Swiss-Prot record:
Residues 410-437 are annotated as: Disordered. This is Glutamyl-tRNA reductase. One of its GO terms (biological process) is protoporphyrinogen IX biosynthetic process from glutamate. InterPro entries: 4pyrrol_synth_GluRdtase, 4pyrrol_synth_GluRdtase_dimer, 4pyrrol_synth_GluRdtase_N, GluRdtase_CS, GluRdtase_dimer_dom_sf, GluRdtase_N_sf, NAD(P)-bd_dom_sf, Shikm_DH/Glu-tRNA_Rdtase. Residues 414-437 have a biased composition (Basic and acidic residues). Belongs to the glutamyl-tRNA reductase family. The active site is at C47 (nucleophile). Homodimer. PANTHER family: GLUTAMYL-TRNA REDUCTASE.
Length: 437
């Protein structure tokens, strides 16, 4: 068993390339990864990255085949084993993000994994791995300043708008979209002394709710063109599967305005028709244009990144031990399962003989079962310890030999054995606790 991943991100690809790959892969994801021998999979998709995680055998070559099939060999990165685990911890910690330290990625990792778990694609191994990633992401933000004063994609868009226009003071801003990203934009722009923040959303009530929170004004979504005529900057961040601002919309608006119009599209898929950039008097920026903010952000946080990496390496060692224990557990279960099956048969036979000869009560059977279970635990205690040691030393041939000798371990596992095997198992919950929601 090994874990591996293939990733394409903002480091090597533009947003539209990532989007195109996702739209190509999404409807046939299982077909794409079918060339790999795997037991579990999960994926992460955001505006800046698309990653597939697999648990299986001989993953490196098949992940390379996937990259070749998708035409991303030169842009994709492939990680297997320890490097894959480290990569996921880095992603959840925010140090692989375009905006270093941004907090949104932690929720995205959790959300993507939960979808895969609910769909039955992710199992125990990935649950432990992603659970650890979420734990590490929380710890990093609690113990370091990596997210202190950090900017999200939303607030980076506001910063870019401020740079392009010189100031946002006294300007009119139109925000299209009142979801998670739109909320981040709204919070960032509310403190910039703008003259007005107009918020448009397909569900008008959501626009009203967000407007009340920041002191903005909710406007009707079907009247976008009217507001394009009067606003200085438009930031669009919906989750629509198609463009919500067309070239025709902007052309009609520009006929009735004399000043330049700045439009920033931070949605994925894109909210604004790309050809809008060709219009006179219009400047269209996208997520790719936020890279310079990312570079400045990285320079400011270099010292904190070193602290984060220290935490990641510490937690990585714990995760590796946990996964090794999981690999040993099947072999341990096989030993106990076979022993219990035979002992159970022998106890029944012995009780029948004692009952026939001495007329013993049912209480005697309970005593015999207690004795048998105690004998099993004592007899297999040392082999159990040795198997765990073998796993931690990467001596997996020992584990495979035990599984071959004792079978697949599908029999019932007793409570006594279960407590032994599961001892020290950490409680990992990928989902946000009620206290955090």
């Amino acid at each position: 068993m090994e874990i591996g991943c293939i990733t394409i991100s903002h480091k090597n690809a533009k947003v539209e390339e990532i989007e195109k790959i996702w739209l190509t892969v999404k409807p046939r994801l299982e077909d794409v990864i079918s060339k790999c021998s795997f037991s579990e999979y999960a994926y992460i998709f955001t505006c800046n990255r698309f990653e597939i995680y697999l648990v299986g055998e001989n993953l490196k070559s098949c992940l390379q085949d996937i990259a070749e099939e998708l035409g991303i060999t030169g842009k994709a990165e492939i990680f297997v084993g320890e490097s894959c685990l480290r990569h996921l911890l880095r992603v959840a910690s925010g140090i692989e993000s375009m905006i270093v330290g941004e907090e949104q990625i932690l929720g995205q990792v959790r959300q993507c994994f939960n979808l895969c778990r609910e769909g039955g694609q992710a199992g125990e191994v990935l649950e432990r791995v992603f659970g650890k990633a979420v734990q590490v992401g929380r710890r990093v933000r609690r113990e370091t300043a990596i997210s202190k004063g950090s900017v999200s994609i939303g607030s980076a868009a506001v910063e870019v708008a401020e740079r392009v226009l010189g100031t946002l003071k006294g300007k009119k801003a139109l925000l299209v979209g009142a979801g998670e990203m739109g909320t981040l934009v709204a919070k960032a722009i509310a403190g910039k002394e703008v003259e007005a923040v107009l918020i448009a959303n397909r569900t008008y009530e959501k626009a009203e709710e967000l407007a009340k929170r920041i002191g903005g004004v909710a406007v009707k979504f079907d009247k976008l063109v009217d507001y394009l005529k009067v606003c200085d900057v438009v930031i669009s961040a919906t989750s629509a599967p198609h463009a919500v601002i067309t070239r025709g919309d902007v052309e009609r608006a520009m006929r009735e305005r004399s000043q330049k119009l700045l439009i920033i599209d931070i949605a994925l898929p894109r909210d604004v028709d790309e050809s809008v950039a060709q219009l006179d008097g219009v400047e269209l920026l996208t997520i790719d244009d936020l890279r310079r903010i990312s570079e400045e952000n990285l320079a400011r946080r270099r010292e904190e990144i070193a602290k984060v990496e220290g935490i990641i390496e510490e937690e990585l060692e714990q995760l590796k031990l946990l996964l090794k224990d999981i690999s040993a557990r099947d072999a341990i279960a096989a030993m106990y399962s076979l022993a219990e099956r035979f002992v159970g048969e022998e106890v029944e036979e012995l009780y029948a003989k004692l009952n026939a000869r001495y007329g013993v009560s049912e209480d005697v059977k309970e005593i015999l079962n207690d004795f048998a279970n105690s004998l099993i635990k004592k007899f297999l205690r040392e082999p159990t310890v040795r198997l765990r040691e073998a796993a931690r030393k990467d001596e997996f041939h020992v584990i495979e030999s035990i599984k071959y000798v004792f079978g697949d371990g599908n029999g019932r596992v007793s409570e006594g054995k279960d407590a032994k095997v599961e001892e020290g198992k950490p409680e990992v919950d990928v989902q946000r606790s009620k206290a955090e929601s």
